[in-house]
């Protein structure tokens, strides 16, 4: 409870209430938190923390594995549940508000940028290893897999690195467009947000709370809200002295948000997040696994129904930057976003959505888009509707290749393997 109390007290302070008023002023604070969801977040996070530690070969220290769950009401921005750690008194770091590399969950923002800049879900992109113009480091997919030319929809579903770098490079000021899309959704710029053609691969750090809120914007027709814990404040006489306004900003074009959601449902229906289909209601989401050299530093699943957006992040070590591979599932090649993070998300969301009305997402109207040239050509054969030029490559190359989750078999999904990342 300490993490939640700290968040509420900080919010009240930001609203102008003094410590004296908060601690002994007779105020009654009504929060946005849902007790059943909060209990489920705590139970699920602690269950899989312990399971990952005890089933690891060899067994690992559960206290060094950190799970964060942040769940947001898509209509209001109210925080429904938040798990930031097991014990505020022994470790007050709240992992739900701690930014870490967002990995392939950041590709959703690149998809927003692409749809705004002349591409559609049917536009074709490079699915094979290639070296961007002016760079010396090739972009590779998981296992160095070669997909051939792929649609943007398939690139989202299968988390194909090369396609997103190809699209970002081909847009006018592509990296800036991706960053703007992320900011518009509700993810604030932070560490790792270098404006280069690999921005979509997810070195950019975002907290689980902000990521849940950013995806909530996609769920609610592109409307961004401010996350908050305080719904209402009453004085000692029961009079309402504060009530959250739940104001929304149309930050992403409604049909762009609908198309991104449509693509993210492909992740669940046929891609790396297939396990989320167990909710038996419309679900959109994205896996993410961040790799630096041979170290997995963060693993994610961020997904939403029409009403609830939830981000799950796993990190390890005191800093949250240590290798997660020690905690990988037996038989897995690495620690995947499609493993424990997705399993945690599904189990939590089964409780969170129980009894809720099954609501459909907005119907996406097709966006007419252009295609990048076939893989053998270094430049687009057909330019998108806007005037576009290749964004200059950064002088320094990223040292990491954020990994995709790999191709899902057509049979019952399993966590796909991760090859040794190529960081040259």
Positions of PLM-derived features:
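Mid-domain, small-residue-enriched loop/turn segments at the edges of structured enzyme/sensor domains
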Residues: 138-140, 172-213
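Non-catalytic, structured segments within soluble enzyme domains
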Residues: 1-32, 183-184, 197-201, 216
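Conserved catalytic neighborhood of penicillin-recognizing serine enzymes
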Residues: 119-178, 224, 236-266
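Proline/serine/threonine-rich low-complexity "mucin-like" segments in extracytoplasmic/periplasmic regions
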Residues: 363-424
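Short helix/loop segment immediately N-terminal to the Walker
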Residues: 20, 52-63, 193
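Short active-site loop at a secondary-structure junction
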Residues: 65-66, 89-109, 117, 121-127, ...
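Extended, hydrophobic alpha-helical segments in both membrane/secreted and soluble proteins
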Residues: 79-80, 102-115, 121, 163-164, ...
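A penicillin-recognizing enzyme superfamily signal
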Residues: 31-59, 69-71, 82-83, 88-101, ...
């Amino acid at each position: 409870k300490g993490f939640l109390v700290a968040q509420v007290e900080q919010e009240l302070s930001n609203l102008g209430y003094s410590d004296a008023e908060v601690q002994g002023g007779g105020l009654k604070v009504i929060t946005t938190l849902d007790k059943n969801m909060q209990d489920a977040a705590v139970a699920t996070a602690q269950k899989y923390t312990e399971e990952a530690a005890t089933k690891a070969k060899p067994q690992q220290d559960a206290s060094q594995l950190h799970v964060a769950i942040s769940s947001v009401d898509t209509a209001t921005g109210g925080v429904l549940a938040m798990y930031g750690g097991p014990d505020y008194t022994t470790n007050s770091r709240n992992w739900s508000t701690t930014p870490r590399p967002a990995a392939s969950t950041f590709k959703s923002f690149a998809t927003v940028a692409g749809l705004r800049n002349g591409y559609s879900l049917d536009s074709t992109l490079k699915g094979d290893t290639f070296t961007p113009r002016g760079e010396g480091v090739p972009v590779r997919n998981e296992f160095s897999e070669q997909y051939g030319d792929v649609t943007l929809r398939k690139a989202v579903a299968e988390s194909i690195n090369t396609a997103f770098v190809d699209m970002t490079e081909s847009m006018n000021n592509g990296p800036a467009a991706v960053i703007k899309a992320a900011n518009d959704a509700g993810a604030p710029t932070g560490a790792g947000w270098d404006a280069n053609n690999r921005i979509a691969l997810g070195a950019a750090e975002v907290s689980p709370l902000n990521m849940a809120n950013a995806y909530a914007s996609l769920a609610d027709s592109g409307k961004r809200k401010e996350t908050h814990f305080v719904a209402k404040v009453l004085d000692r006489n029961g009079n309402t002295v504060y009530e959250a306004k739940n104001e929304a900003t149309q930050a992403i074009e409604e049909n762009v948000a609908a198309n991104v959601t449509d693509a993210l449902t492909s992740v669940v229906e046929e891609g790396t997040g297939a396990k989320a289909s167990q909710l038996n209601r419309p679900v959109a989401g994205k896996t993410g696994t961040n790799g630096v050299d041979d170290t997995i530093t963060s693993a994610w699943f961020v997904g939403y129904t029409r009403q609830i957006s939830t981000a799950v992040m796993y990190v390890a070590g005191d800093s949250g930057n240590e290798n997660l591979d020690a905690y990988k599932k037996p038989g897995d090649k690495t620690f995947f976003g499609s493993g424990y993070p997705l399993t945690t998300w599904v189990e939590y969301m089964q409780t969170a959505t129980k009894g809720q009305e099954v609501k459909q997402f907005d119907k996406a109207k097709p966006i007419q888009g252009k295609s990048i040239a076939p893989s053998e050509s270094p430049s687009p054969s057909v330019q998108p509707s806007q005037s576009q030029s290749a964004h200059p490559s950064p002088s320094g190359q990223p040292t990491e290749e954020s990994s995709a989750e790999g191709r899902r078999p057509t049979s019952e999904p399993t966590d796909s393997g991760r090859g040794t990342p190529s960081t040259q």
